[in-house]
């Protein structure tokens, strides 16, 4: 329709001249044409008023599409989109983006994309690929990419999963260019360019052009254009004066036509048909024939695009609107037809161009004839006016001819003219269109209209040319700028190459920067433009240009001279082929490097058959010539003909085949033999290497997998024991917490009997108060607020301690678990390793030869690792023996000790050395005893490490523990006559070791030194043999040392008179010496007893039995020291502190039982009776507590003891040095405090004061008596255990209440009196055995302990020797568990560990010393002292008197002598065991009554008050 319609406008004139149908038919024709061709009909009636009205209506919708001209889109080509598509996309983008915006919103883009008819899923995928910056809006390159992808999808091509790298790079660079090219001021853009003064050189062209250019910039005012037309029409009529007469109607039609021109201009406000026609005229002035063709051709197709380029940015929208409507073509054709007629005289030139297109040559002749009449005159009038004149004249002719016979002419002419016209018009347009295609660098043909100024450029840029750039500007017309393409045309390339050769005088193949600068400045462009052009051309950035780069630069200059912009990036069309190839290669290399060299294979669309399906199979062999096939086939035929299966073979053929087969078989045999020999050599070489490696491994490695399995099994066994041990440890901590609260409770009751813990609200400070408490608080009298607060504090402290301990246990558990996990991870073998081990270590699942070789390797391993295996066995044996030793019952341990003692002196010495060594002597044990000692040492080490984890340091008592260890080993050898020497030595060692504790208070060093000298002579040999049992004793000693140090910190310092200080110092030195002697005596038997208590080898049990007892005994001893020697470590303060509280009860019991001098005697009786009843046991032979109890007694010392108990004492009786001498002698003669066995049997307390006298008296008995005493003691041991535990607990609790009175009464005697007491006490020893009741008292112990406990402590001082015997016996073990639960336990602990006995002894001397400093100690217990005196008389009501001094015992202590005796005896009470024996004495001892009478008559109590 469009083409035929255009043709109608062109074809009217010639035929109308020949055929002139009548006008009525013309009218019919005009109406009939519209029916077939709507637009042509309008054109035909363009002179009528109706057409003028309909033309605007047809274009009413077109102007609504307004482009956003403010968008600054860089002129960059996207290589994957054609130039035509990119123009369309840009137009669509400009129309959719509102003014002021640079990007298209998501909603707008979705509306546009939905028009494509694709599914939302596909569009969503396209959006994901297009929205590169993920901003939700699309810039132009992204929008173009999205439309391109839509086109792909519409064509059925699959969308790429990932945007191709090349596309992505181009789009991204386009986006960057947009972001960086924010529009600048136009004045800045034009600055330094030859276009800055356009008006100057445009004014030279002529007024019509300048007048037309002015309206073009402002928006094409129609008035100026119509005026020019009018002036042109004014001359036309003059030129056609003759015709005017003949065409009267034409004039009228002309007038109508002129009126039609005005509305035509109105309809084309935004379009520019008049400028196109005017330029057509201009074209005629340039070239005769070509110009007309150039003007006509472009206007017929996309005419609006030409004015768009020539006129600048303002013309672009005008050109695009008619392009989309398609309605302008008919109007333009009508306008162009007269142009052609107006140029009819030049038709010959046009015919040459249109030869292919015009099939009717008469058409041109008709034009010539018609225009010869007067059309040439109009052409001469002016370039613009004659065009319009011819146009109008043509219209007049058309109108006239239409009136005559238009009906047939259109049909015939329409068929011919459109073809010729349309063919030529697209030809010119299509030639320029390919220029936009990428990659056609240097191969683009010259556009039809030609490129303006090329020849001038060649002349201006020649080296010796004198022309200037102004000449170039004159030639460069904007009219033909639309023909300037992006790509370089062939003609351009030839011109630029000639220029390059002219400037490259040296034939170097390049032009350097200086020469290029001279060439480029000839263009007259500004510096800024030339810099941009150089940057784009010099792609290698080397400062010089080769031929292709020079051509690119010249082309950019040419474009800029034509008014086109310089691109920000070099478009694909201008990239030289060599550079493009290099860039593509580099991009592919970069991409391959990014992907790690892996070749990306994209899934191609299967719309077409893929070439891969026709490729050869790789499994096929390469090319094989036909000759080979022939040979192979012939050989196969021959072979087939000669096979043995063929029946037609002759005998010769068969023989031949046999020979051939034999030859082949022999050859195969030879090859097999060679291979076998080679493989054998390789196997032998490998075997030799394996042998060498195995030898190296055997010499340096361990058991490997076997050791791992053994260690893993051991780890699992150990891990199973950990939970039970931790549970026991938690139980011990719980018990300790409970016992500490009980201890505080008993202490508070002793201080205030009316205090009731049930009334104390432990939950918070604001507890409930009853009426009495409130009244007491109001009146300030009485009340138990202090006691309540102490109790609450004790409960809180116990809870916090328990929490801390439990936290430490948890930390230990977590540490153990982590260690276990780490070890198991390293030791565990995977299934794969296990399989490999069975296969290659044991030879399972392999061939016989390999299995034999594996066996040989195993033999080699066994031969190479005998020493290691033995050492491993030894270590495992030693570990198992140590583990066994931990579980050995006390009987076994005692047997070991007995055997050890019976061993020869050499054996003993070796044992000592072995024990002292750190496990090094494990292989040198000659007896079970030595190994048992080693096991104990190992246990001690483990205990020390565990205690360190709990935060308890054991370094302080380490040397002491070693010495005690030596003592324990040496004491068990009573068969030799060395006991006196051993005990003496031990006595020397202990005083020195106890020096630190003695330092706590001022000590009379003279006494200590003298005592050390006297004891050293007797006990020298004792130290070394006792080293074996160091561990357990050292642990307990460490516990006590730590506790004493803590108590020292808690005790407030008290100041006293100088006399008091001296007395306390002397007493303390004596106390420490006595303590050391008692400890030495007890140390040997205690180690076995501890083992007995440790029957379960669990760590928790051991810790419970050792740590709890040690702490309590330390507390008891320290309290005794503090209370008896108030000067430096005042006892009152110690009593208030919790750690020291457990010791106070024992001290109180000792001090509150002054009337118990007879108790020692009584205690010996039950021991002897039990000994006679039960046969001697061999395991107790070496135990000093079980030796013969019937030994000669030193009557002098016994009498001294009696005097001391009765209160008749000399001034010097209290000297500790004498007591310690007697103590030293006792163990020497009795071996191990035999007198203690006589006095107290199996009791576990260790009163050091009496122990000293008893030991001194017992030193004289013969060896036979020692053995008898040991046997009797062993028999009595079991019976006394129960009594001890019950009596000690109860007695200790009661003794605390009565502690102060006894102390106050005993403290008064002077040092001289004390010494006299000591001398008198010696004779008292014989009486002690007599009064001791047998086991009978044991049952009574529970009931009497509350009141009786005080008496036992007193005798314990003087009966100290017997006390040690009890602790050494089995009883100590049972006591350990009981100790933690109640306060009394502390005393038993000392009994177990020789350490406790020592502390009790010192307290005795300290008590008298404390008299001078009564304020400190008595301050707390000052009130109680008075009561003790009265209760003493009521001996029978012992239970009722617990709060005060026990009935019978208290009386004697009240007297000065008795008090001194009591004070001396009190120290021994530190060990609970004496309490049990004393309880028995209390029930039926007459001596107690005597003591009571003495107590009642004593004045000590009065003094204390």
UniProtKB/Swiss-Prot annotation:
- Record keywords: Coiled coil included? yes
- Tell me the SMART domains matching this sequence: EH
Q: Where is the composition biased (Low complexity)?
A: 1133-1175, 1321-1330, 1454-1472
Q: Domain named EH: which ranges?
A: 85-174, 492-581
The EF-hand domain covers 118-153, 525-560
Write out the coiled-coil annotation as residue ranges. Answer: 677-752
**Membrane topology designation:** Peripheral membrane protein
Q: Where is the composition biased (Pro residues)?
A: 1331-1453
Q: Where is this region: Disordered?
A: 1-30, 364-416, 422-441, 588-620, 867-927, 948-1505
Which keywords does this chain's UniProt record carry?
Actin-binding, Cell membrane, Coiled coil, Cytoplasm, Cytoskeleton, Endocytosis, Endosome, Membrane, Repeat
GO molecular function annotations of the record: actin binding; calcium ion binding
Q: Which GO terms describe its biological process?
A: endocytosis; endosomal transport
Q: State where composition is biased (Basic and acidic residues).
A: 960-980, 1034-1050, 1069-1079, 1109-1123, 1261-1280
Q: Does the keyword Cell membrane apply?
A: yes
What's a single GO CC term here?
actin cortical patch
* PROSITE patterns, sorted: EF_HAND_2, EH, WH2
Please state where this protein is localized: Cell membrane; Endosome membrane; Cytoplasm, Cytoskeleton, Actin patch
Start-end of Polar residues biased regions: 364-393, 403-413, 588-604, 872-885, 1086-1096, 1193-1208, 1283-1319
> Which CDD domains does this chain map to?
EH
Which ranges carry the WH2 domain? 1474-1491
Can you tell me which family this protein belongs to? Belongs to the PAN1 family.
Q: What does this protein do?
A: Component of the PAN1 actin cytoskeleton-regulatory complex required for the internalization of endosomes during actin-coupled endocytosis. The complex links the site of endocytosis to the cell membrane-associated actin cytoskeleton. Mediates uptake of external molecules and vacuolar degradation of plasma membrane proteins. Plays a role in the proper organization of the cell membrane-associated actin cytoskeleton and promotes its destabilization.
The record's PANTHER family line, in alphabetical order, gives: ACTIN CYTOSKELETON-REGULATORY COMPLEX PROTEIN PAN1, EH DOMAIN
| Quaternary structure note | Component of the PAN1 actin cytoskeleton-regulatory complex.
Q: What is this protein called?
A: Actin cytoskeleton-regulatory complex protein PAN1
- Which species is this UniProt entry from? Lodderomyces elongisporus (strain ATCC 11503 / CBS 2605 / JCM 1781 / NBRC 1676 / NRRL YB-4239) (Yeast)
Q: Which gene encodes it?
A: PAN1
């Amino acid at each position: 329709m469009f083409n035929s319609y255009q043709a109608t406008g062109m074809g009217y004139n010639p035929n109308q001249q020949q055929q002139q149908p009548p006008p009525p038919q013309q009218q019919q024709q005009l109406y009939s044409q519209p029916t077939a061709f709507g637009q042509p009909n309008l054109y035909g009636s363009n002179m009528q008023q109706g057409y003028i009205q309909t033309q605007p209506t047809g274009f009413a919708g077109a102007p609504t599409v307004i482009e956003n001209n403010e968008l600054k889109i860089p002129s960059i080509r996207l290589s994957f989109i054609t130039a035509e598509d990119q123009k369309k996309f840009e137009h669509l983008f400009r129309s959719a983006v509102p003014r002021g915006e640079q990007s298209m919103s998501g909603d707008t883009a979705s509306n546009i994309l939905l028009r494509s008819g694709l599914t939302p899923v596909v569009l969503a995928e396209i959006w994901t690929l297009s929205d590169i910056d993920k901003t939700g809006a699309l810039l132009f390159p992204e929008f173009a990419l999205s439309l391109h992808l839509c086109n792909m999808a519409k064509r059925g091509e699959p969308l790429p999963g990932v945007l191709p790298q090349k596309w992505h790079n181009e789009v991204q660079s386009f986006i960057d260019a947009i972001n960086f090219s924010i529009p600048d001021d136009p004045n800045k853009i034009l600055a330094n360019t030859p276009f800055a003064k356009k008006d100057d050189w445009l004014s030279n062209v002529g007024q019509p052009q300048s007048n037309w250019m002015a309206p073009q910039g402002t928006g094409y005012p129609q008035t100026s254009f119509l005026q020019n037309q009018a002036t042109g029409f004014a001359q036309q009529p003059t030129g056609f004066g003759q015709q005017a007469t003949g065409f009267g109607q034409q004039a009228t039609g002309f007038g109508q036509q002129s009126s039609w021109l005005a509305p035509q201009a109105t309809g084309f406000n935004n379009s520019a048909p008049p400028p196109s026609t005017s330029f057509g005229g201009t074209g005629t002035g340039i070239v005769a024939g070509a110009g007309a063709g150039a003007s006509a051709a472009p206007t017929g197709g996309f005419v609006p695009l030409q004015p768009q380029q020539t006129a600048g940015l303002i013309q672009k929208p005008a050109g695009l609107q008619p392009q989309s409507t398609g309605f302008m073509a008919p109007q333009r054709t009508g306008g162009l037809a007269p142009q052609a007629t107006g140029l009819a005289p030049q038709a010959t030139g046009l015919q040459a161009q249109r030869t292919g297109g015009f099939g009717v040559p008469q058409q041109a002749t008709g034009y010539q004839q018609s225009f010869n009449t007067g059309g040439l005159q109009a052409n001469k009038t002016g370039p613009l006016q004659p065009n319009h004149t011819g146009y109008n004249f043509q219209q007049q002719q058309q109108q006239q001819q239409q009136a005559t016979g238009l009906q047939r002419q259109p049909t015939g002419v329409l068929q011919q003219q459109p073809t010729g016209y349309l063919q030529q018009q697209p030809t010119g347009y299509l030639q320029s269109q390919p220029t936009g295609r990428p990659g056609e660098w240097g191969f683009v043909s010259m556009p039809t209209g030609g490129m303006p100024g090329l020849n001038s450029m060649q002349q201006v840029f020649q080296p010796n040319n004198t022309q200037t750039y102004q000449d170039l500007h004159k030639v460069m017309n904007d009219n033909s700028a639309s023909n300037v393409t992006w790509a370089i045309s062939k003609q351009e390339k030839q011109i630029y190459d000639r220029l390059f050769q002219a400037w490259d005088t040296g034939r170097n193949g390049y032009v350097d920067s200086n020469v290029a600068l001279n060439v480029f400045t000839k263009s007259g462009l500004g510096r800024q433009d030339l810099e941009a052009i150089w940057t784009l051309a010099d792609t290698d950035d080397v400062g010089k240009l080769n031929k292709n780069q020079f051509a690119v630069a010249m082309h950019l200059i040419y474009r800029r001279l034509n008014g086109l912009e310089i691109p920000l990036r070099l478009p694909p069309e201008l990239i030289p082929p060599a550079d493009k190839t290099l860039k593509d290669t580099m991009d592919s290399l970069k991409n391959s490097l990014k992907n790690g060299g892996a070749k990306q294979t994209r899934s191609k669309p299967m719309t077409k058959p893929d070439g891969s399906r026709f490729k050869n199979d790789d499994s096929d062999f390469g090319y094989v010539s036909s000759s080979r096939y022939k040979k192979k086939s012939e050989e196969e035929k021959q072979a087939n003909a000669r096979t043995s299966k063929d029946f037609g073979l002759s005998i010769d053929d068969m023989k031949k085949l046999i020979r051939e087969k034999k030859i082949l078989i022999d050859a195969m045999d030879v090859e097999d033999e060679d291979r076998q020999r080679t493989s054998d050599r390789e196997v032998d070489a490998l075997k030799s290497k394996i042998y060498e490696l195995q030898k190296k491994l055997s010499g340096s490695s361990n058991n490997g997998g076997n050791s791992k399995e053994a260690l893993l099994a051991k780890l699992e066994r150990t891990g199973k024991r950990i939970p039970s041990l931790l549970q026991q440890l938690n139980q011990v901590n719980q018990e300790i917490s409970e016992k500490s609260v009980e201890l505080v409770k008993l202490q508070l009751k002793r201080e205030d009997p009316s205090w009731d813990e049930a009334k104390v609200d432990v939950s918070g400070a604001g507890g409930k108060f009853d009426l009495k408490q409130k009244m007491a608080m109001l009146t300030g009298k009485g009340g138990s607020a202090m006691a309540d607060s102490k109790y609450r504090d004790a409960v809180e402290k116990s809870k916090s301690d328990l929490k801390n301990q439990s936290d430490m246990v948890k930390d230990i558990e977590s540490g153990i678990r982590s260690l276990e996990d780490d070890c198991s991870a390293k030791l565990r073998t995977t299934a794969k390793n296990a399989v490999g081990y069975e296969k290659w270590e044991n030879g399972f699942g392999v061939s016989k030869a390999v299995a034999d070789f594996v066996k040989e390797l195993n033999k080699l391993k066994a031969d190479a690792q005998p020493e290691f295996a033995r050492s491993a066995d030894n270590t495992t044996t030693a570990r198992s023996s140590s583990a066994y030793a931990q579980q050995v019952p006390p009987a076994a341990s005692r047997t070991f000790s007995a055997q050890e003692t019976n061993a020869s002196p050499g054996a003993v010495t070796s044992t000592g050395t072995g024990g002292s060594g750190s496990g090094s002597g494990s292989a040198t044990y000659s007896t079970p005893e030595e190994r048992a000692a080693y096991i104990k040492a190992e246990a001690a080490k483990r205990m020390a490490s565990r205690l360190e984890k709990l935060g308890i340091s054991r370094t302080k008592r380490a040397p002491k523990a070693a010495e005690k260890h030596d003592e324990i080993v040496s004491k068990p050898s009573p068969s030799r006559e060395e006991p006196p020497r051993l005990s003496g030595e031990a006595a020397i060692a202990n005083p020195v070791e106890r020096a630190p504790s003695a330092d706590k208070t001022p000590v009379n060093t003279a006494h200590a030194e003298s005592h050390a000298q006297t004891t050293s002579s007797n006990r020298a040999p004792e130290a070394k043999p006792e080293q074996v049992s160091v561990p357990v004793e050292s642990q307990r000693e460490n516990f006590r040392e730590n506790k004493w140090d803590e108590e020292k910190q808690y005790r407030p310092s008290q100041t006293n008179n100088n006399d008091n200080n001296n007395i306390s110092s002397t007493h303390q030195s004596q106390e420490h010496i006595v303590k050391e002697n008692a400890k030495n005596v007890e140390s040997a038997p205690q180690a076995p007893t501890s083992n007995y208590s440790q029957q379960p080898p669990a760590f928790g049990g051991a810790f419970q039995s050792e740590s709890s007892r040690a702490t309590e005994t330390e507390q008891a001893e320290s309290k005794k020291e503090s209370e008896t020697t108030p000067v430096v470590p005042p006892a009152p303060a110690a009593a208030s502190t919790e750690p020291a509280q457990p010791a106070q009860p024992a001290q109180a019991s000792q001090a509150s039982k002054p009337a118990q001098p007879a108790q020692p005697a009584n205690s010996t009786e039950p021991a002897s009776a039990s000994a006679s009843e039960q046969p001697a046991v061999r395991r107790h032979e070496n135990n000093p507590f079980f030796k013969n109890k019937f030994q000669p007694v030193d009557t002098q010392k016994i009498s001294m003891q009696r005097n001391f108990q009765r209160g008749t004492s000399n001034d010097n009786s209290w000297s500790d040095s004498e007591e310690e001498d007697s103590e030293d002698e006792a163990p020497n003669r009795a071996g191990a405090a035999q007198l203690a066995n006589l006095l107290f049997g199996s009791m576990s307390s260790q009163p050091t004061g009496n122990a000293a006298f008893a030991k001194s008296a017992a030193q004289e008995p013969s060896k036979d008596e020692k053995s008898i005493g040991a046997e009797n003691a062993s028999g009595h041991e079991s019976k006394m255990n129960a009594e001890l535990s019950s009596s000690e607990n109860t007695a200790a609790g009661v003794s605390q209440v009565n502690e102060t009175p006894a102390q106050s009464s005993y403290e008064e005697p002077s040092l001289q009196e004390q010494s006299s007491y000591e001398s008198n006490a010696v004779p008292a020893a014989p009486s002690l055995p007599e009064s001791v009741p047998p086991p009978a008292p044991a049952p009574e112990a529970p009931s009497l302990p509350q009141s009786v406990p005080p008496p036992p402590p007193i005798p314990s001082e003087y009966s100290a020797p017997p006390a040690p015997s009890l602790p050494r016996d089995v009883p100590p073990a049972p006591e350990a568990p009981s100790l933690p639960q109640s306060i009394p336990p502390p005393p038993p602990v000392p009994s177990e560990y020789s350490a406790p006995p020592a502390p009790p002894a010192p307290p005795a001397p300290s008590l008298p010393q404390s008299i001078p400093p009564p304020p400190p100690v008595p301050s707390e217990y000052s009130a109680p002292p008075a009561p003790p005196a009265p209760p003493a008389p009521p001996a029978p009501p012992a239970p009722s008197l617990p709060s005060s001094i026990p009935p019978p015992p208290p009386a004697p202590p009240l007297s000065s002598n008795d008090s001194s005796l009591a004070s001396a005896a009190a120290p021994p009470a530190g060990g609970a065991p004496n309490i049990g024996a004393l309880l028995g004495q209390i029930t039926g001892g007459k001596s107690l009554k005597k003591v009571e009478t003495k107590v009642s008559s004593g004045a000590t109590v009065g003094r204390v008050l």
